Amino acid sequence: MVGKAVTTPAVLREVLLKYLAHHPDASDTLDGIRGWWLPDMQPPPSAEALHATLEALEAEGKLIHTVMVDGSVLYARAR
């Protein structure tokens, strides 16, 4: 029996950084990132795994986040 593929934090990080390299002005919410930045990732990352990876990239200075008036959070490449 073939095991189910696992989206590791390292793979998720690599995919996000590649997306931002090709779309340097991109910004989106966690749900938007899951739907638009990672549409072909199978299995799709959990919201928790994606949030942890986004926080790690922010801690590394690769991403920033902005809290909008409605409370939603946008993530974007750090400049």
Regions of interest found by a model, annotated:
Residues 1-27:
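Short alpha-helical segments that sit at the start of domains
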Residues 26-38:
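Short acidic, hydrophobic short linear motifs in intrinsically disordered regions
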Residues 35-47:
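Short helix-coil junctions and helix-kink-helix linkers
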Residues 50-60:
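Basic amphipathic alpha-helical segments that dock to polyanions
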Residues 58-68:
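A short, conserved structural fragment
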Residues 67-79:
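Short, cationic-aromatic polyanion-contact patches
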